[in-house]
């Protein structure tokens, strides 16, 4: 949005000069003044306290619902991708040998393919789920039909059943939790964290570079993060 405002301002200066030199009759960019509003950022409820997050992980560990929901809940904290990307995860996107989940650009918010390093814990969760849904397309198929993935509200509904209100935790909140706790650890480059979250990086050249940058650090960070989640689940950071 800031880039759009700057472009309008530049265009307005060009047209004002054109009017002053009799090359134009008016400044059409003036019509956009005040029309370019910044969209309201939607914040999703998330748990960012380590002890409280550990308690959530223990509740997830004890969850006894549908297997697709149960394993999606277990995997979500480890990979911290957007809920839509997680629920539509396909077996064809998972490379067990290279320990990576490659999300195609068509599923990504930024329309760029995104590689997610998989920790030993994440691979173990997927290995267990493969015994249940490996013959189908989706990692987390719907309980009604294996031809579709679980719905977009399934994870949120499970969180409500576990006693977490929408003001406390959401499916999208796993991303906020990871971002907050990883940054607070002070162990990782903030750019590597942002890349793991697949956040937009300004500038086309930087975006191309950023796609492959920090991969080694991201792999190490993914394993550290999963180990840290295990520690929290077992009662660490009390």
Q: Where is each model-derived feature located?
A:
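Basic, Lys/Arg- and aromatic-enriched nucleic-acid-binding interface segment
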Residues: 1-12, 20-88, 97, 108-112, ...
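Residues in the recognition helix of alpha-helical DNA-binding motifs
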Residues: 7, 14, 89, 158, ...
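Residue-level detection of the helix-turn-helix DNA-binding "recognition helix"
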Residues: 9, 16, 91, 184, ...
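Short, contiguous acidic/charged loop-to-helix segments that flank catalytic cores in large enzymes
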Residues: 43-45, 61-64, 105-115, 142-147, ...
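Catalytic-site neighborhood detector that most strongly recognizes the C-terminal catalytic loop/helix
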Residues: 47, 102-111, 123, 187, ...
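Short, basic (Lys/Arg/His-rich) helix/loop patches that form interaction surfaces
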Residues: 58-70, 79, 116, 124, ...
